[in-house]
């Protein structure tokens, strides 16, 4: 079984995880297709992953022992058996189309067939909370670079270079934009609505983030404050650092939202602050799972002063008790020796005091 080169895996992963911005309360369905040529190892490897909102629900891999479109979400068990046969055939047909596309791109770019190349597409549709269509897209890439894309109006194409203009002319003559627009505005929306109904307990839930702020000294003069949001769903979230109530957008390092591995997501935002001014900075967290936005600050660890005072007081108390015991013993000894004359302290008396000192920590 051949393997996808690391660079291509990163491209595929970037496509799957760099989620397109969506409107609050909206839903989306997205597919990512990747074909990778591997000279001398047979047919190109072809992979499909499909997402509803931020949940992967189907996958196809031509390198599987028995290549079939596979279920990736529990709620997909509700579809009829013939669904999987139909989707598997579509995937296999598309794999052959992409094989041809790879060969065509080699000619357009005047490249040798000896190297490995990739051809990818991502497409999808988005609907409002009430199910109405409001956005669709379809984009293609070759060897990790933009190739051609359907414009926002879904009626025309934009080619990234002169090689892609060959494809643009061919597709314009064949009316490909109209065919894709019909799919995105109607069939894609119908399937998305159906999937949302089947998986509503998962897809339409709102898990609030668990948020906190960590402190990382960078130097004697500066420290990094990092605001964490963990375990939230859906993926849409806002993390904003403020200084004295003013947004610090330009000075904030913000990572892309990442899967947490358990069906939820993670994200953090960091800002570098002058040491000693940490309390002037607050992190504002907004997510649909929260009844109201969270406002967080860094909480310095509790100072050990109280603990030290308690230890010192305890030691002093022990010394006072020992001193009182020694005084009582001496008085009793003095009384017993008084019958025969003056009391003379024993030679080892100061060693008792020395023994008392040894109890000090």
From Swiss-Prot:
Q: May I have one GO cellular component term?
A: MHC class I protein complex
Residue ranges for the region (Connecting peptide) are: 299-308
Q: Write down the glycosylated positions.
A: 110
Q: Where are the transmembrane segments?
A: 309-329
Which of the residues are on side Cytoplasmic?
330-361
Q: Where is the signal peptide?
A: 1-24
Query: Has UniProt tagged this entry with the keyword Secreted?
Result: no
Q: Which SMART domains match?
A: IGc1
PROSITE patterns annotated for this entry?
Answer: IG_LIKE, IG_MHC
Topology feature Extracellular, residues: 25-308
Q: Where is this region: Disordered?
A: 335-361
* Membrane disposition: Single-pass type I membrane protein
Biological processes, Gene Ontology terms:
antigen processing and presentation of endogenous peptide antigen via MHC class I via ER pathway, TAP-independent; antigen processing and presentation of endogenous peptide antigen via MHC class Ib; immune response; positive regulation of T cell mediated cytotoxicity
Q: Name the segments for region: Alpha-1.
A: 25-114
Region span, Alpha-3: 207-298
Q: Kindly give the InterPro entries that the UniProt entry links to this protein.
A: Ig-like_dom (IPR007110), Ig-like_dom_sf (IPR036179), Ig-like_fold (IPR013783), Ig/MHC_CS (IPR003006), Ig_C1-set (IPR003597), MHC_class-I_related (IPR050208), MHC_I-like_Ag-recog (IPR011161), MHC_I-like_Ag-recog_sf (IPR037055)
Give the family from UniProt.
Belongs to the MHC class I family.
State what protein this is by name: RLA class I histocompatibility antigen, alpha chain 19-1
Tell me what organism the protein belongs to.
Oryctolagus cuniculus
């Amino acid at each position: 079984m051949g393997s996808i080169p690391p660079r291509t895996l990163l491209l595929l992963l970037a496509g799957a995880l760099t989620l397109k911005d969506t409107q609050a309360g909206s839903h989306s369905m997205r597919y990512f297709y990747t074909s990778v040529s591997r000279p001398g190892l047979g047919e190109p490897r072809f992979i499909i992953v499909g997402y509803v909102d931020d949940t992967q629900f189907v996958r196809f891999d031509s390198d599987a022992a028995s290549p079939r479109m596979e279920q990736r979400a529990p709620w997909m068990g509700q579809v009829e058996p013939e669904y999987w046969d139909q989707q598997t055939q579509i995937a296999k047909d598309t794999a052959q189309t992409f094989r041809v596309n790879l060969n065509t791109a080699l000619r357009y770019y005047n490249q040798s067939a000896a190297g490995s190349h990739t051809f990818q597409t991502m497409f999808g549709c988005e609907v409002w909370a009430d199910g109405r269509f409001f956005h669709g897209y379809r984009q293609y890439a070759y060897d990790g670079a933009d190739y051609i894309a359907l414009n926002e109006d879904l009626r025309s194409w934009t080619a990234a270079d002169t090689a892609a203009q060959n494809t643009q002319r061919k597709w314009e003559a064949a009316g490909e934009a109209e065919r894709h627009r019909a799919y995105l505005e109607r069939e894609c929306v119908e399937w998305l609505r159906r999937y949302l109904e089947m998986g509503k307990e998962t897809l339409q839930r709102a898990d609030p983030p668990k948020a906190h702020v960590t402190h990382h000294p960078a130097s004697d003069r500066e420290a990094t404050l990092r605001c964490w949001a963990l375990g939230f769903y859906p993926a849409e979230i806002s993390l904003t650092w403020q200084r004295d109530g003013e947004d610090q957008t330009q000075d904030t390092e913000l990572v892309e939202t990442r899967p947490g591995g358990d069906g939820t997501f993670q994200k953090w935002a960091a800002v570098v602050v002058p040491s000693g001014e940490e309390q002037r900075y607050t992190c504002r967290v907004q997510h649909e799972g929260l009844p109201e936005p969270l406002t967080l600050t860094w909480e310095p660890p509790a100072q050990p002063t109280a603990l030290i005072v308690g230890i010192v007081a305890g030691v002093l108390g022990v010394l006072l008790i020992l001193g009182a015991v020694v005084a009582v013993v001496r008085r009793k000894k003095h009384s017993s020796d008084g019958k025969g004359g003056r009391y003379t302290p024993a030679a080892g008396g100061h060693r008792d005091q020395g023994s008392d000192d040894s109890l000090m920590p």
